[in-house]
Amino acid sequence: DYTLANGTLTINAGATSGTITIAGIVDDSLDEANETVVITLSSPSNATLGTDSVHTYTITDNDNAPVVEFNTTSSSGAESVSSKDITVDLSAATAQDVTVNYAVTGTATGSGTDYTLANGTLTISAGATSGTITIAGIVDDSITEGSESVILTLTSPSNATVSYTHLRAHETNS
């Protein structure tokens, strides 16, 4: 993200200051936390160290956080499929883990009656561009009933913003 090697600063006779240059600061497109460069003065000759011998320079990230959203806004399947993976995408990779909460609602009954999935938090690891929420244990019962829905709602992201917040998954009787 920058170039700065250990070295020696020479302040010429008669001068009262010198300059250390942090070169090559990279303006990348990767969303990341601010970064710091710490410069420490040590071992002076013909001078003594003052009280301010350490300088911290902060490289402020100027990239937007990625957008987190469902890969699609709806899907469907027969109750005989046993599980359904729902993909959540990031608009770009990031150097930070992204978390997003999801709430589960709809006309299907959770807790193992029609499916198994509780409210939760999805984590998409740094460098990845998608994650998966799995509606598990979809029950293939013999009860005659209409199509049922599971609605997932994304909320409270960290290190990202939310775009499409809802996904409706339909379960049809087989």
What label would you give each PLM region?
Residues 1-168:
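Short boundary segments that mark the start of a structured unit
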Residues 166, 173-174:
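Single conserved hydrophobic/aromatic residue that forms the stacking wall/gate
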